[in-house]
Design a protein with these regions (language model features):
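Glycine-rich phosphate-binding loops that contact phosphosugars or nucleotide phosphates
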Residues: 126-134, 140-253
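Mixed-charge, polar/low-complexity N-terminal
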Residues: 9-11, 181
């Protein structure tokens, strides 16, 4: 990063930023009546208007030069193609693969990983449909009314964001809860709201070694087993989202 901010193009951008600050947005529109058209983009239902920002054609040219200087285009292509962009773990990132269409195909290490990804997505959809249709029921036969996510960091914020973003479309018969720390107050407050007989717990941990998540899962599982002693009951009320299925099975899920 230090080399980047010392580069000539970065210095040019810095000077340009100081210069453009002296101009008001209204002046930029007076100077160029076509400004709104030049500094806006549209794609299907999306429309982006950045004409009301301190940006000129020179700004875009300088930013493009900066992108070229760090091979941004090639880095984006590497990310999308499954190249090893995570130098620490020597792994591809593949975030974008989760959103690739089923028929696209993405070969990584000689295998089409989209086949595996869409198999997991299909499994998720089937599970959701079972819950929505009341086919997935608790051990006692009662329908699921509450879903609790146990996770921390991205394993908490990701699902939480999805629930908030899709709130207008959610199944009104379901309530969602999130436990992300080991605070007794949060757990006790949750236990006052839910009924084990109608609750589905989702333990979310990529490695299935996250201390806080497993501690909460252990506490809840212990309380659950005090009420339901049959081992089969766990399958109706606990799920794991993880890359380490073996560890989840060892845990008892």
């Amino acid at each position: 990063m230090s080399a980047l901010i010392k580069s000539p193009i970065w210095q040019d951008l810095t000077q340009h930023a100081l210069s453009i600050k002296k101009q008001s947005i209204s002046e930029l529109f007076i100077d160029d009546p076509e400004r709104c058209k030049k500094f806006s983009l549209s794609e299907q239902a999306l429309y982006l208007d950045y004409s009301k920002n301190p940006v000129t054609l020179q700004t875009l040219q300088l930013l493009a030069q900066l992108a070229d200087s760090v091979a941004l285009k090639q880095r984006i292509q590497a990310l999308f193609s499954g190249a090893l962009v995570n130098s620490t773990q020597q792994l591809p990132a593949l975030h974008t693969a989760l959103r690739d269409p089923r028929k696209t195909g993405l070969i990584v290490n000689g295998k089409d990983i989209l086949t595996k990804i869409h198999a997991a997505l299909d499994k998720m959809q089937h599970l959701v449909e079972q819950i929505h249709n009341n086919h997935w029921r608790g051990f006692s036969g009662k329908k699921i009314t509450d879903i609790v996510n146990l996770g921390i960091g991205g394993s908490d914020l990701g699902p939480l964001m999805a629930v908030h973003a899709l709130k207008a479309h959610h199944q009104s018969t379901l309530r969602f809860h999130f436990i992300s720390n080991v605070d007794d107050k949060a757990l006790c407050a949750l236990l006052e709201k839910i009924n084990f007989a109608t609750t589905l717990f989702i333990i979310t941990s990529k490695s299935f070694t996250t201390l806080e998540t497993l501690l909460n899962a252990t506490r809840i599982l212990k309380l659950f087993q005090e009420k339901y002693t049959q081992p089969a009951a766990i399958k109706s009320h606990f799920l794991a989202v993880t890359c380490q299925a073996e560890k989840a099975i060892e845990f008892g899920i």
